Curated annotation (Swiss-Prot):
Stored Pfam families: Spermine_synt_N, Spermine_synth
Annotated organism of origin: Xanthomonas axonopodis pv. citri (strain 306)
EC assignment: 2.5.1.16
Example GO BP: spermidine biosynthetic process
Residues where S-methyl-5'-thioadenosine binds: 35, 110, 141-142, 167
Gene Ontology CC terms: cytosol
Matching InterPro entries: PABS (IPR030374), PABS_CS (IPR030373), SAM-dependent_MTases_sf (IPR029063), Spermi_synthase (IPR001045), Spermidine_synt_N (IPR035246), Spermidine_synt_N_sf (IPR037163)
Coiled coil: none
Domain PABS: 5-241
This protein's pathway: Amine and polyamine biosynthesis; spermidine biosynthesis; spermidine from putrescine: step 1/1
Chain residues that bind spermidine: 66, 90, 160-163
Name of the gene: speE
PANTHER family named in the record: SPERMIDINE SYNTHASE, SPERMIDINE/SPERMINE SYNTHASE
Stretches that traverse the bilayer: none
Designated name of the protein: Polyamine aminopropyltransferase
C-alpha cells in the first residue's frame, strides 16, 4: 500500500494487482485494540474506509456488497425470523437485513466497536437501523459468540468479515463452520463473503471444503461487481444443510419486496444463480 497527496493505492499481493483512489484529504484515524481504521475523503467515490490499509468500503459502491450478502439469502430462506451477522461493523448489512419486515431479530457481533463508531460518524446512511428495536449490536469475538449460540435457534448466519487474516482468520475454518451448523435450524442458511471469483477460486473451494467438513451439504457462490475491491468482482457463498439444495428463492416476494435497493432485484437474483462457465467448472457445479 502507498499514499501521497493525491492518491491512495492498495497493492493486493494475492492477485498481483492494485487499486487506487484519488483523495482530497484524510478525515480520521484510530488505532483500536485490534486494527487501524482510517477514513479518507475521495474526489469521486465519497468517503473511503480502510482497515489495516485494506479498502473496506466507499460511499459510492458499498451497496453492491451489502445488498448481495443479505437479500439473496433472506429471499432463499422460506421465512427468516432470526438473523445473526458476524462482523459487519460498518452496519450496512444490518440495514439491509432489517428492510425485511418478517425478520424479528438481527444480532450483529463484531469484535471491534471502533469500526461501528467510525461508520456512525462518517457513513451515517449505513447506520439507519442501529436503533431499530429488532437490532442487537454486540462487540465481542464472533467465533466465541457462535460457539455459544443455542442449537437450532438461528435462521440465517451472515459472515460479513474482512479478508481471512488477522482478526477474521478464525471465521474461515471447520471449527467455526461447525458452530454455525449447530446454531442453524434444519432449513437455515449460512452466507459468507468469499473474495474474488476471478482471482481467488482456490480460496472459495477451500471455504466450501471446510463448510462441507462441518456438515453443510450444498453450496452456491454468487458473483457480483464490487469496484473498490481487488479485480472489481466479488462473491458471497451460501451453504445449506440440505443435500442437493437448488437455492431456489421466493421470486414473488422478491419482486414485491416493498423496499428500495440499488442493485438487487428478483431478475438479477435469477441470473446470478447461473455461474459463468469457468466459475462453475472450478467449483464443480
Amino acid at each position: 500500500m502507498s499514499a501521497n497527496d493525491n492518491w491512495y493505492i492498495e497493492h493486493f499481493q494475492p492477485t498481483g494487482s492494485a487499486i487506487g483512489f484519488r483523495i482530497s484529504g484524510k478525515l480520521d484515524e484510530v488505532q483500536s485494540p485490534f486494527q487501524k481504521i482510517e477514513i479518507y475523503q475521495t474526489t469521486d467515490w465519497g468517503k473511503l474506509m480502510l482497515i489495516d490499509g485494506a479498502v473496506m468500503l466507499t460511499s459510492r459502491d458499498n451497496f453492491f456488497y451489502h445488498e448481495m450478502i443479505s437479500h439473496p439469502a433472506l429471499f432463499t430462506h422460506p421465512a427468516p425470523k432470526r438473523v445473526v451477522i458476524i462482523g459487519g461493523g460498518d452496519c450496512g448489512t444490518l440495514r439491509e437485513v432489517l428492510k425485511h419486515p418478517g425478520v424479528e431479530s438481527a444480532t450483529q457481533c463484531d469484535i471491534d466497536e471502533q469500526v461501528t463508531r467510525m461508520s456512525e460518524k462518517y457513513f451515517p446512511e449505513l447506520c439507519d437501523s442501529n436503533h431499530d428495536a429488532r437490532a442487537e449490536l454486540l462487540f465481542d469475538d464472533g467465533v466465541a459468540y457462535m460457539a455459544n449460540c443455542q442449537a437450532g435457534s438461528v435462521d440465517i448466519v451472515i459472515v460479513d468479515s474482512t479478508d481471512p487474516v488477522g482478526p477474521a482468520e478464525g471465521l474461515f475454518n471447520k471449527a467455526f463452520y461447525e458452530s454455525c451448523f449447530k446454531a442453524l435450524k434444519d432449513d437455515g442458511i449460512l452466507v459468507q463473503q468469499s473474495e474474488s471469483p476471478l482471482a481467488l477460486l482456490d480460496l472459495i473451494n477451500e471455504m466450501r471444503t471446510e463448510m462441507g467438513k462441518a456438515g453443510f451439504q450444498s453450496f452456491k457462490t454468487l458473483p457480483f461487481p464490487q469496484p473498490c475491491y481487488p479485480t472489481g468482482w466479488w462473491s458471497v457463498t451460501m451453504a445449506s444443510k440440505q443435500a442437493k439444495a437448488d437455492f431456489a428463492f421466493r421470486q414473488d416476494a422478491a419482486q414485491a419486496k416493498g423496499f428500495d435497493t440499488l442493485y438487487y432485484t428478483a431478475h438479477l437474483h435469477t441470473g446470478v444463480l447461473v455461474a459463468p462457465p469457468f466459475v462453475a467448472k472450478a467449483l464443480g457445479e
